[in-house]
């Protein structure tokens, strides 16, 4: 298993190549590069920010800047670069230290190597006043067709690389079979020394340092030192999740996952982001530009990654499968997020109450409980919500078109479940019966609420007067007695009510609606309780005067109680 680097998925363009790309192709390239980088970072890979990404974040063109490199560019290396034409290209920049890539396309050497072509990539690091001097080179990725006579080939199987260092660092040298070895403490390998190889003639064509599966071999001790530096251990560890990184800057960027820090703010809408590249991608949404169009349905997107994700809905392809439960996903990020369910890994912890969550979105949603933030506001009534899903559910109330209409009373509802629940009023079907008193209900929820009257379980207590209730809704309704709140207003006469049901009954005075009809005589009533009392006449029952008096007294006492509280709170 080898580690994927950004260079494995990156594409470089010269100025000449970049000129031939149109705007759509350039936008496609930019989105792909940013998406590839974000995918690598999300997998926890400790990679420096590529220079091409830094250019994209600054809104600059990502094509390579080419310069001709002559033998006078670096005086210290004049003799080593004779008879060569090298081109220098700026490439990836480390966050802590700038880097350059020297890409040698064609080497024009003496007649012995005139037909030898290969690609060499070296990275030169420099600082401050040493900017114009060669400090050291790092072999990155090297390919060749054939090795000329006298060239030493250096192989590191652990990192899947072949190192060609001939005539760039030193004259041709020969490694003694009896030489001492340099040992790499990182890879725990023995490496041949260069103490006895200077100024020796080459007599066997080329030297290939053969190695076993994990050997890293070098002909010079300074090459070993460089190798160890470039492949040092990851010493920066996250205290929250234990993930390790090779650089402090990468750890700092990773830390934002736990802290929720988002230092990059959009000046258009105020939305914040944890990475500059995410802000750049977001700002495209304000321009309204959507150059990426789905050929199946015609839907357009501002980012190529969004188009790619959308296209999976047409194909139904889900190549990423969970090995634990077999569930498949169309995106690898969804699979990674899903795997936390099996591991019960909760990386995101609330710093206020200590509650932990599997998903970062769940933590953000939870934190709004502490802050009281309600950013989603209904344009119809101004009511605010902490979640967009809550706002969507609320907006159904204001929907002009309501799909579900009762064929009995023509009342409309926003969902089928509400319509079915309402229709039980007209059918008077009450299949749910209380085993204690025999009372029947048309909904199981109503029966469950009724059963609390028998058990006398009242878990909801008023914090002001101490009165307890069996239902949470009853507590909310009672609490309005203390606050005097009457949010439900009749649009006909302006009268206000503390309960929506009271407003509904009141509005029937204006509309003349009487939905409760007696099956015996056809008489209709505006209240269900009036119909129940009327039906006793047909059954030969005579309502007890005691019960009527108790009901009247109870209603009166409730009104007196409400008025007394209103005076206390006034």
Curated annotation (Swiss-Prot):
Residues in C2H2-type zinc fingers: 236-258, 264-286, 292-314, 320-342, 348-370, 376-398, 404-426, 432-454, 460-482, 488-510, 516-538
KRAB domain boundaries: 4-75
A single GO BP: regulation of transcription by RNA polymerase II
Keywords, ordered alphabetically: DNA-binding, Isopeptide bond, Metal-binding, Nucleus, Repeat, Transcription, Transcription regulation, Ubl conjugation, Zinc, Zinc-finger
GO cellular component: nucleus
Localization of this protein: Nucleus
CDD domains assigned: KRAB_A-box
Family annotation (Pfam families): KRAB, zf-C2H2
Disulfide-linked positions: none
GO molecular function: DNA-binding transcription factor activity, RNA polymerase II-specific; RNA polymerase II cis-regulatory region sequence-specific DNA binding; zinc ion binding
Primary site of residence: nucleus
Glycyl lysine isopeptide (Lys-Gly) (interchain with G-Cter in SUMO2) crosslink residues: 125
Free-text function comment from the UniProt entry: May be involved in transcriptional regulation.
Similarity remark: Belongs to the krueppel C2H2-type zinc-finger protein family.
Annotated protein name in UniProt: Zinc finger protein 181
Species name: Bos taurus (Bovine)
